[in-house]
UniProtKB/Swiss-Prot annotation:
Provenance organism: Arabidopsis thaliana (Mouse-ear cress)
Compositional bias annotation for Acidic residues: 318-345
Highest taxon listed in the record's lineage: Eukaryota
Any one Gene Ontology BP term: rRNA processing
Protein name, per record: Peter Pan-like protein
Family: Belongs to the PPAN family.
Residue ranges constituting the Brix domain according to the UniProt record: 34-295
Pfam families from the UniProt entry: Brix
Entry GO MF terms: rRNA binding
Gene: PPAN
Keywords of the record: Coiled coil
Keyword Coiled coil: yes
Role played: May play a role in cell growth, differentiation and cell cycle progression.
Amino acid sequence: MGRFKNNKKSRVIGKPIAKKNQEDVSHVTGDKIPKSFVFSRMKLAGPVKQLQMDLRKLMLPYTALSLKEKKRNTLRDFLNVSGPMGVTHFLMLSKTASSLSLRVARTPQGPTLTFKIHQYSLASDIAQSQLRPRCPQDLFKSPPLIVLSGFGSQELHLKLATIMFQNIFPAIDINTVKLSTCQRLVLLNYNKDTKLIDFRHYSIRLQPVGVSRRIRKFVQNHQVPDLRNLQDVSDFVTKAGYGSESEGDEEAATVTLSSDLGRVNKGATKSAVKLQEIGPRMTMQLVKVEEGLCTGGIIFSEYDVDGKKEKLKKKQDEEEEEDSEEEGEEGSEEDGEDMDEDFED
């Protein structure tokens, strides 16, 4: 007896990305706010699965944090759902026996950039390595800022990578942006010698210059400090400066605020900008660029064997042509000498 076929179409289930109080159009560019799906079309192991969740958290608030993917889901299923939900980018993790890769694609027609992940660290690994990890939930109410370093090359694949990363997060207007929304930073640094990209995710915090950690904690928490071991209240204010986690405030890392930010940082005063890594962290390499959505012509390939063979063959042909030209010149000189001898005879 044959098995009955299930004719029901497979669907991708996920919570809506945009809430009612969220804007769908950027007031800076006038275009749709970029939104993303982070998923995999295969079953991932424990650490790689957690890396996928860390990437989803990084892309908040304009992503589907609880996206449900099933084994039978195809890329077409995700594409069909992305249209009504306003999704503009796909981030797809894939794992083989020898490598881990991340594809970043623009919907619905591409292009697609494939990165080979050489090393990665989870957000939990970063937190465990820090003395005082800092990752409050309020950080993820606003999208991160994006900073690209070393991508000034004129090569086409690096230009495409620059445009892709710049458009994956909402644009900001430095004249109208609220300081309270600048809570996170994504940094991508390209090394032209190794062709590797260092991917880092930081939280941004401001500290008033010249104020000790004890005073900052007291103002922020509004809790009565423990003064049992002190002779006088002034000892609490004057004792020991910055604490183990901080260094002196460098002039280059200080800014003057235009408005109040929180309980401690007041407008028209100097504050020190502090970055603290929250993860995930990746070291990756751009290995392929495709014209379409995971398909189409290959614009760039780091492992383009056929292209390298063609270049090598072309170089060999040019060398052979040069050799033949030199031989021709030598032959003409010998013929000239023979003709002179004939005239003398």
